[in-house]
Amino acid sequence: MNLAMLHDNVLVEALEDSNPNSPIQLPDSAKKKPTKGKVVSVGPGASNSDGKVTPMSVKVGDCVYYRQWAGNEIEFDGKKFIVMKESDIIAKEA
């Protein structure tokens, strides 16, 4: 991945919670936005009032859960990602 995040931004690839074998298929407009994803890129962290960088608590490869309407969707190299602030991440799998 050649997309470097700045500050306390995190690039996440959403993981769909769909079951293609289910007899009930919802149209895209009726599906909930995913809230689970894999961290693909992480910025160095936010600067505090003293100018020191607060390190990030997530790293590339982490599986995270985030707020439903977190971040902004982008497309890079033909794939869709979500760029969000670290504070939009509410949990990570241990």
UniProtKB/Swiss-Prot annotation:
Any one GO molecular function term: ATP binding
Region of interest (Disordered), residue spans: 17-53
Cytoplasm listed as a keyword: yes
SMART domains: Cpn10
Localisation: Cytoplasm
Keyword annotations of the record: Chaperone, Cytoplasm
GO terms, biological process: chaperone cofactor-dependent protein refolding
GO CC annotation: cytoplasm
Family note: Belongs to the GroES chaperonin family.
Subunit description: Heptamer of 7 subunits arranged in a ring. Interacts with the chaperonin GroEL.
Purpose of the protein: Together with the chaperonin GroEL, plays an essential role in assisting protein folding. The GroEL-GroES system forms a nano-cage that allows encapsulation of the non-native substrate proteins and provides a physical environment optimized to promote and accelerate protein folding. GroES binds to the apical surface of the GroEL ring, thereby capping the opening of the GroEL channel.
Listed name of the protein: Co-chaperonin GroES
Species annotation: Anaplasma phagocytophilum (strain HZ)
